[in-house]
Amino acid sequence: MEIAYQVGQVVIRGSLDLQQQWQDQLAQFRASRDAGFDTYCWAHHYLIDPFQHFQPFPVLARLAAEPGNMKLATSVLLLPLLNPVDVAEQVATLDHICEGRLILGLGLGYRPEECEAFGTQMSERGARHSEALELMQKLWTEDEVNHHGRFYHLTGAHPTARPYQKPYPKLWLAAMSDPAIRRVGREGHPLFIGPVQPYNTIRRQVDLYHQTLEEYGHPIPEDMVIVREFFCAENREDALDKARRGFERKYAEYSAHGFQGTDEEMTSKITGDLEALMDDTFIVGGPDECVEQIARYRDLGFNQVSIRLFYPETPQKDVMDHIELVAKDVVPGVHKL
């Protein structure tokens, strides 16, 4: 099983100088690479108050220049907000800069503020995503592209750049709600499940995904990815104590701002009791216990786990110590699964 280092929006606006934030995150990248993580995953949002965050394409292009062969992923890019022609050519360019190490994770997004800012509708996200991806695949594989859909139109278009990987980079498609799970299965893409679904829901949704793949005649893709909030310490008691302090601020902000665009179960969990959310969805404990919890997802068919190791107002030294502990006792255990 492979393990990825997940970077999300966790730095509270104004709590850290932006240049210091970048230098800290660059140091975290180098530490996670040296720790043996297989992939470095960078999230994507706009106007995500109260956090400050950098955009994925320039970040991943910069990281591609670092030594090593760590894979680089968008986790996930909010495709319905963007123009697919621009995304297709940005991805092709970045894939060459990465020399084929790019993974393109795609998702719908869940925030009305972002849809409003980009002139799209929440209700159109699924349709826009499907059509945009179809058009991007044409731009990556066809010499001349003609496309006349609901949202996008091209006539006799000739792509400017093709990806390094053939026919194009590996895709991960995010889904939280059952309709989104069905859409990913219907289109035959690898499934990427985010950090808030509880285990029993995931088990049911994996069954739904496989049923949908079979219904539409698709083989089971090679990859299936799970993202989890994560905190490891020398023992479970210390891990729970440190995790609670780290998670509290982040999920207090999620609760205050709501968690839109998912099903009712997800909304109630993310805006409800933190202790229940931790019990249901997070990986927390000593090193062996963390590996055992990850193994449960391996048993469901996941071959990739992406973990978030730092949270609002976590000192950089604590982040680096956390990476060091995970490198010593968790990464090797996950690789053996």
Segments (PLM) and residue ranges:
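N-terminal beta1-alpha1-beta2 module of alpha/beta enzyme domains
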Residues: M1-E66, M70-K71, K166-P169
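Hydrophobic faces of well-ordered beta-strands that scaffold small-molecule active sites
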Residues: I3-V7, Y40-W42, L72-T74, L102-L106, ...
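An alpha-helical appendage that flanks or caps ligand/catalytic pockets
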Residues: Y5-V7, S123-P159, N200-N303, E313, ...
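Internal, glycine-rich beta/alpha segment that forms the wall or movable "lid"
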Residues: M1, N83-P190, N200-D207, Q211-I220, ...
